[in-house]
Design a protein with these regions (language model features):
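Non-catalytic signal-transmission and effector/linker regions of two-component phosphorelay proteins
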Residues: 1-2
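Conserved acidic carboxylate
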Residues: 7
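Two-component/phosphorelay signaling modules centered on CheY-like receiver
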Residues: 10-34, 69
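Conserved protein kinase catalytic core
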Residues: 13, 40-41, 61
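Acidic, metal-coordinating helix/loop segments flanking the phosphotransfer/catalytic sites
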Residues: 17, 32-51
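Short loop/edge segments at beta-strand edges and connector loops
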Residues: 31-37, 60, 99
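CheY-like receiver
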Residues: 49-113
Length: 113
């Protein structure tokens, strides 16, 4: 399953990548993106992945700004420390909403759904 991570915290990327490797070894990490601008640029020249893990607060703004520029058609699992965006997340292809710190069980359950 071709997957990308949109996250600006290196420790969170390492944690999520490690968990995904343990829980779902068939996941193919395509890229890691750390900003709204970088994500928009990447999608302009690459095919849609099969799954996205996306943090909401990125260094250059809210990840929801991405949806104003790109029509994302694959499932999204949001990963954030903030619970107040859950309703908004489910309006943009979200299949799950994981609160940080993310553990193995969180990832297992998100991928089962």
């Amino acid at each position: 399953m071709k997957t990308i991570i949109i996250e600006d915290e290196k420790a969170a990327i390492r944690n999520l990548t490690s968990l995904l490797t343990e829980v779902c070894p068939q996941i193919e990490m395509v890229t890691e993106l750390d900003s709204i601008a970088g994500t928009i640029e990447w999608f302009a020249s690459h095919p849609m992945p099969e799954l996205i893990f996306m943090d909401i607060h990125l260094a250059d703004g809210s990840a929801f700004e991405i949806f104003e520029h790109i029509h994302i058609t694959c499932p999204i699992i949001f990963t954030t420390a903030y619970d107040e965006y859950a309703l908004r997340a489910f309006k943009v292809n979200s299949i799950d909403y994981l609160l940080k710190p993310i553990g193995r069980k969180d990832v297992e359950q998100a991928l089962e759904d």
